[in-house]
A protein has these predicted regions:
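N-terminal non-catalytic cap/leader segment that marks the start of a structured domain
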Residues: 1-90, 192, 200, 206-207, ...
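A generic local secondary-structure boundary/capping motif
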Residues: 4, 58-60, 81-83, 107-116, ...
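Short, structured patches in soluble enzyme cores that scaffold and shape functional sites
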Residues: 7, 95, 111, 118-122, ...
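Catalytic-pocket segment enriched in acidic/His residues
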Residues: 9-10, 51, 78, 84, ...
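Residue-level recognition of short, solvent-exposed, well-ordered loop/turn junctions
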Residues: 63, 70, 117-119, 234, ...
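Structural signature of FAD isoalloxazine-binding scaffolds in flavoprotein oxidoreductases
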Residues: 86-103, 118, 258-269
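RNA pseudouridine synthases
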Residues: 126, 133-148
Length: 282
């Protein structure tokens, strides 16, 4: 099953994406849907107003998650290009809801920086309250997977040892277009092994990142277990699992996003983001 949040004339709506149409579930957005314990059954049975798939205006998948937890230095090739060793524990930081944009919305390049970089990421969306679970128990916490680009403002990020200021600029983080439930992604495979899918970033059609989600140092299940030691994960929370090698900042010379560039982020079987970069005017 695939779920999305779309913009309509009467506000945002959660929808189930069928092969030929989008069907309203009766909720304002996917986050609101997930807060109901019976969300899966309700979404599967939904028979609300419908929309053609062509031309859907995708809002951020979960517009106002309680938590957006990101993971740094979590792909082996990215760690190598940074000249580091794999960390013994996940490197965690946060984003806030104002950073999020829809799957085809414009990425806002901050007026104060010329060093804005791309980071393709697999994101996990939580589907039930989760605290103190093991990695073996973690799959039950997952509502689904989606695509995120952790667009990063490198000069601000590197001003201090804390990355937050380079990760929290408004309207920089596309997420979506859909939440894909595990049963669809793992059909015929063993979900215990985690998701293996090609992940890529293109800028103006040039492939700049290409890897596989099986290259994660800490996979989704391990991350959920670790984070749940620290804080309760609630329905709609987003975990961005990290980016592979090929970021612009690590290139020689460095490359960054510019006004008018088209940023395409793709994970096989999960979805595609396509965002035009626009320079902020102040």
């Amino acid at each position: 099953m695939r779920l999305a949040t779309i913009r309509t004339e009467s506000g945002t709506r959660a929808v189930r994406l069928d092969a030929d149409r989008a069907v309203e579930t009766g909720d304002a957005d996917v986050g609101a849907l997930l807060r109901g314990a019976d969300w899966r059954d309700r979404a599967a049975a939904a028979a609300g107003p419908t929309y053609p798939l062509d031309g859907l205006d995708y809002a951020p998948l979960v517009p106002t998650p309680e938590k957006i937890i990101c993971v740094g230095a979590n792909y082996r090739d990215h760690i190598k290009e940074m000249g580091r060793e794999p960390p013994p524990y996940p490197t965690l930081f946060a984003k806030f809801p104002p950073t999020l944009i829809g799957a085809y919305d414009d990425v806002l390049l901050p007026a104060v920086s010329e060093a804005v970089d791309w980071e393709a990421e697999l994101a996990v969306v939580i589907g039930r309250p989760t605290r103190h679970v093991t990695a073996e128990q973690a799959p039950a916490a997952i509502a689904g997977y989606t695509v995120l680009n952790d667009v990063s403002v490198r000069d601000y990020q590197n001003r201090t040892l804390q990355w937050l200021q380079g990760k929290m600029f408004e309207a920089t983080t596309p997420i979506g277009p859909a939440l894909v439930t595990p049963d669809e992604l793992f059909s015929g495979t063993d979900p215990a092994a985690g998701l293996s899918a090609e992940i890529t970033t293109e800028v103006d059609g040039e492939v700049l990142q290409r890897s596989d989600t099986d290259q994660l140092v800490f996979g989704a299940y391990m991350l959920i277990a670790y984070i749940s030691e620290i804080i309760t994960l609630n329905p709609g929370d987003v975990i961005a699992t990290g980016t592979p090698g090929g970021v612009g900042h690590a290139r020689k010379p460095p490359r960054y996003l510019i006004d008018g560039a088209v940023l395409t982020t793709r994970i096989a079987g999960v979805g595609e983001l396509r965002n035009t970069c626009r320079k902020e005017k102040v």
